[in-house]
């Protein structure tokens, strides 16, 4: 059975990567400011944007594998599972992560708009690719 990190609030992930809590509803991390940490397969109860120059190959997202090429953004939403199972290896990453609790947008116009953003959907298997302008 796979070990799954249950991210019930943004600071669960912060604690996992040895970062201090920022706010009860929001976590913003710059990976270059963190030490070594382990990979994780995550069950999200939060929204998130993972922004990296290069993602590791084989990131699972639901029953699929995410396709990333170069600088990309991966979006996650509550109820979704994704990541790379912990194999015991300590790693570093380059980039940013923003996680926020659904409570932050509950009852707001932004909550309604987010429902229409396809990149938070399980049906998406491609990252949002960033290209220089």
Regions found by a protein language model. Give the residues of each.
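Conserved metal-binding segment of the jelly-roll/cupin
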Residues: 68-82, 99-100
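Short beta-strand His + acidic residue motifs that chelate non-heme Fe in jelly-roll/DSBH
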Residues: 58-60, 76, 82-90
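Generic protein-terminus/edge-of-domain signal
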Residues: 1-67, 72
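A generic structural signal for short beta-strands and their flanking turns/coil linkers
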Residues: 55, 78-80, 94-96
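A hydrophobic/aromatic-rich effector-binding and dimerization subdomain
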Residues: 4-7, 85-133
């Amino acid at each position: 059975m796979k070990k799954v990190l249950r991210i019930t609030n943004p600071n669960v992930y912060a604690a996992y990567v040895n970062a201090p809590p920022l706010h009860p509803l929001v976590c913003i991390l710059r990976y270059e400011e963190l030490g070594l940490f382990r990979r994780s397969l995550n069950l999200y109860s939060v929204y998130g944007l993972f922004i990296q120059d290069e993602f590791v190959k084989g990131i699972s997202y639901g029953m699929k594998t995410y396709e990333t090429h170069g600088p990309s953004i991966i979006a996650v939403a509550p109820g979704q599972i994704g990541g790379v199972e912990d194999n015991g290896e300590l790693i570093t990453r380059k980039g940013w992560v923003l996680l926020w609790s659904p409570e932050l947008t509950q009852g707001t116009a932004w909550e309604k708009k987010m429902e229409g953003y396809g990149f938070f959907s399980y049906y998406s298997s491609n990252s949002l690719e960033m290209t220089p302008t």
